[in-house]
Amino acid sequence: MARHSFFCVDGHTCGNPVRLVAGGGPNLNGSTMMEKRAHFLAEYDWIRTGLMFEPRGHDMMSGSILYPPTRPDCDVAVLFIETSGCLPMCGHGTIGTVTMAIEQGLVTPKTPGKLNLDTPAGLVAIEYEQDGQYVERVRLTNVPAFLYAEGLEVECPDLGPIKVDVAYGGNFYAIVEPQENYTDMDDYSALQLIAWSPVLRQRLNEKYKFQHPELPDINRLSHILWTGKPKHPQAHARNAVFYGDKAIDRSPCGTGTSARMAQLAAKGKLKPCDEFIHESIIGSLFHGRVERAAEVAGRPAIVPSIAGWARMTGYNTIFIDDRDPFAHGFSMA
């Protein structure tokens, strides 16, 4: 029996939690971060569930673990952990991780104000603005994003048949826009969206195949993005992003914003250099931008960037005690 200790720096990005594991993370095998992610999932997923789920975490908890980079063009590598698993990429997690890692001196950039992250989804370039000891803003240039499928039909509880577009922005997103059986996210409660989303996700994954053309380990739809009209005067659109089993992202969701921009660009509604300001369910904003056009295995794509802010909330030394019947966490149905 052992008691495992993890030193964490806690914070949030635009309202959504980030738990940066600064000490206690396991050594991982693999020549790439995708391979290290696979090793973590095979042998150490109890760390994720123990730190993310109750009683040490909660349904919305999201986090990261820092590693030495596996590629020479990067400053640091990041493994993303949350209640839904080990995501290949996490936008709000990146902004929070970079903010806290810089402020706490956990990483020293080769060039001040810039940082290259080695993630399972690929290289993510960072620019950050620092005022004294505090990081005030982080802009990440994400992996290429693309529209994967249009008009996929699925039966939604209570609403009936709806159509969704699926886009990739670091994860696969089903995007639900206004249509005959769905009006606007504001017309439904968060509890309704949380109840419908896992059913939609399961039915879509059973009915359709979602496979990244270059990354074989990215092979399922993981998120549902419900759209709505913005309330903030600066915003172009509003969203409620569902992930995990019962979570609505409190931030505007970085990879979700990337997927949304890719969808809009594919339909001619955004072009390179266009700005896209995305509003979350609680009113916080991400400032997106289409950096340039791209291709992914012959598919039209974009390279999106996302800017946002994060704040550290404290230090947390967490024990996972093998004697504890809830050592590996639990989630209430």
Swiss-Prot record:
Catalyzed reactions: trans-4-hydroxy-L-proline = cis-4-hydroxy-D-proline
Physiological role: Allows intracellular utilization of 4-hydroxyproline, one of the major constituents of host collagen, by converting 4-hydroxy-L-proline to 4-hydroxy-D-proline, which can be further metabolized by intracellular 4-hydroxy-D-proline oxidases. Strong B-cell mitogen. Plays an important role in the regulation of intra- and extracellular amino acid pools, allowing the bacterium to profit from host precursors and enzymatic pathways.
Organism taxonomic ancestry: Bacteria, Pseudomonadati, Pseudomonadota, Alphaproteobacteria, Hyphomicrobiales
Native organism: Brucella abortus biovar 1 (strain 9-941)
Keyword terms, alphabetized: Isomerase
Domain of life: Bacteria
UniProt name for this protein: 4-hydroxyproline epimerase
Extra remark: This enzyme does not require pyridoxal phosphate (PLP) as a cofactor.
Enzyme kind, highest EC tier: isomerase
Residues given in the record as substrate binding sites: G91, H92, D249, G254, T255
EC identifiers of the protein: 5.1.1.8
